[in-house]
Amino acid sequence: MPTQPSRDLQTFPNPKPGRPFEIAMECPEFTCVCPMTGQPDFATIRLRYVPAERCVELKSLKLYLWSFRDEGTFHEAVTNRICDDLVAALAPRWIEVVGDFAVRGGIHTVVTARHGERPAGV
């Protein structure tokens, strides 16, 4: 498995595809670059999803998130991109991606992107 930042999200078969369950992850070291100022933006990315047939492999997720480190992107765009890329890789029953960005200019920004319907009881 690679050790450099990569947009290649690896997956593995859901070990319990017949049972709806939630997977939650928190990635507190996310960074990207503000496209307006060129300054770094720091965020905690929170993922919650109910898998269907595939689950995301954690090291590939870490390397995927690292791949944004030098990319100029708006908070709204990168949060939605992460959600879209995870949907493409996993085809989950439901997913929520929250980008909780550090204060910049006195403003704290939280962006939430969702896909699918959350199964009842999960």
Swiss-Prot record:
<keyword id="KW-0560">Oxidoreductase</keyword>
<dbReference type="InterPro" id="IPR029500">
    <property type="entry name" value="QueF"/>
</dbReference>
<feature type="active site" description="Proton donor">
    <location>
        <position position="41"/>
    </location>
</feature>
<feature type="active site" description="Thioimide intermediate">
    <location>
        <position position="34"/>
    </location>
</feature>
<dbReference type="InterPro" id="IPR043133">
    <property type="entry name" value="GTP-CH-I_C/QueF"/>
</dbReference>
<dbReference type="InterPro" id="IPR050084">
    <property type="entry name" value="NADPH_dep_7-cyano-7-deazaG_red"/>
</dbReference>
<dbReference type="GO" id="GO:0006400">
    <property type="term" value="P:tRNA modification"/>
</dbReference>
<comment type="function">
    <text>Catalyzes the NADPH-dependent reduction of 7-cyano-7-deazaguanine (preQ0) to 7-aminomethyl-7-deazaguanine (preQ1).</text>
</comment>
<dbReference type="InterPro" id="IPR016856">
    <property type="entry name" value="QueF_type1"/>
</dbReference>
<dbReference type="GO" id="GO:0005737">
    <property type="term" value="C:cytoplasm"/>
</dbReference>
<feature type="binding site">
    <location>
        <begin position="56"/>
        <end position="58"/>
    </location>
    <ligand>
        <name>substrate</name>
    </ligand>
</feature>
<comment type="similarity">
    <text>Belongs to the GTP cyclohydrolase I family. QueF type 1 subfamily.</text>
</comment>
<keyword id="KW-0521">NADP</keyword>
<feature type="binding site">
    <location>
        <begin position="75"/>
        <end position="76"/>
    </location>
    <ligand>
        <name>substrate</name>
    </ligand>
</feature>
<comment type="pathway">
    <text>tRNA modification; tRNA-queuosine biosynthesis.</text>
</comment>
<keyword id="KW-0963">Cytoplasm</keyword>
<protein>
    <recommendedName>
        <fullName>NADPH-dependent 7-cyano-7-deazaguanine reductase</fullName>
        <ecNumber>1.7.1.13</ecNumber>
    </recommendedName>
</protein>
<keyword id="KW-0671">Queuosine biosynthesis</keyword>
<dbReference type="Pfam" id="PF14489">
    <property type="entry name" value="QueF"/>
</dbReference>
<dbReference type="GO" id="GO:0033739">
    <property type="term" value="F:preQ1 synthase activity"/>
</dbReference>
<dbReference type="GO" id="GO:0008616">
    <property type="term" value="P:queuosine biosynthetic process"/>
</dbReference>
